[in-house]
């Protein structure tokens, strides 16, 4: 089992990223909470991973902290919640998700991508005791790379690419194309310089 990856961030297009380790590229699926903390392309990234095997696929999921990986593992134990839906749910910070569950906030949960009322109700029941065991104390996540957290502005900003990438990411998380386009359009402004910034702003308006 692969528990952690340390390598060069070669590609990133939410929710997928590619980590190059000694010339071998590892395709990793990561939640947006991890994407927000990624370093720039070409820099070293460290990810805590979970290897998922099913009858039809083998997938590697990556997280910026052990806490997030633990939440992912808790989520996929819930009936009806697979890895893809768990990644969508983790568009919300683990501490915020735990608070929603403990507060019984059904309204907030149904706004998460792919989560309907029945799934939200199941999450409230099945996750209540589990999140109590999760360390949700606000703290700095372990950096995903040496340059993580540094704001970089690309001198050439292609607005169309940023918008297209953001919409694609939201659709990949489980939102309908019309929902994604509407959220991205509402969130975009001239201060946004990366697709990650736009995705974060769009999700903030939806969740």
From Swiss-Prot:
GO terms for cellular component: cytoplasm; Holliday junction helicase complex; Holliday junction resolvase complex. InterPro entries: DNA_helicase_Holl-junc_RuvA_I (IPR013849), Hlx-hairpin-Hlx_DNA-bd_motif (IPR003583), NA-bd_OB-fold (IPR012340), RuvA (IPR000085), RuvA_2-like (IPR010994), RuvA_C (IPR011114), RuvA_C_sf (IPR036267). Residues 65-142 are annotated as: Domain II. Gene3D superfamilies: 5' to 3' exonuclease, C-terminal subdomain, DNA helicase RuvA subunit, C-terminal domain, Nucleic acid-binding proteins. It comes from the Bacteria. Keywords: Cytoplasm, DNA damage, DNA recombination, DNA repair, DNA-binding. Residues 158-207 are annotated as: Domain III. Pfam families: HHH_5 (PF14520), RuvA_C (PF07499), RuvA_N (PF01330). Residues 1-64 are annotated as: Domain I. GO terms for biological process: DNA recombination; DNA repair. It is found in: Cytoplasm. One of its GO terms (molecular function) is ATP binding. Residues 143-157 are annotated as: Flexible linker. The keyword DNA repair applies. Belongs to the RuvA family. Has three domains with a flexible linker between the domains II and III and assumes an 'L' shape. Domain III is highly mobile and contacts RuvB. Homotetramer. Forms an RuvA(8)-RuvB(12)-Holliday junction (HJ) complex. HJ DNA is sandwiched between 2 RuvA tetramers; dsDNA enters through RuvA and exits via RuvB. An RuvB hexamer assembles on each DNA strand where it exits the tetramer. Each RuvB hexamer is contacted by two RuvA subunits (via domain III) on 2 adjacent RuvB subunits; this complex drives branch migration. In the full resolvosome a probable DNA-RuvA(4)-RuvB(12)-RuvC(2) complex forms which resolves the HJ. The RuvA-RuvB-RuvC complex processes Holliday junction (HJ) DNA during genetic recombination and DNA repair, while the RuvA-RuvB complex plays an important role in the rescue of blocked DNA replication forks via replication fork reversal (RFR). RuvA specifically binds to HJ cruciform DNA, conferring on it an open structure. The RuvB hexamer acts as an ATP-dependent pump, pulling dsDNA into and through the RuvAB complex. HJ branch migration allows RuvC to scan DNA until it finds its consensus sequence, where it cleaves and resolves the cruciform DNA. This is Holliday junction branch migration complex subunit RuvA. It comes from Saccharophagus degradans (strain 2-40 / ATCC 43961 / DSM 17024). The gene is ruvA.
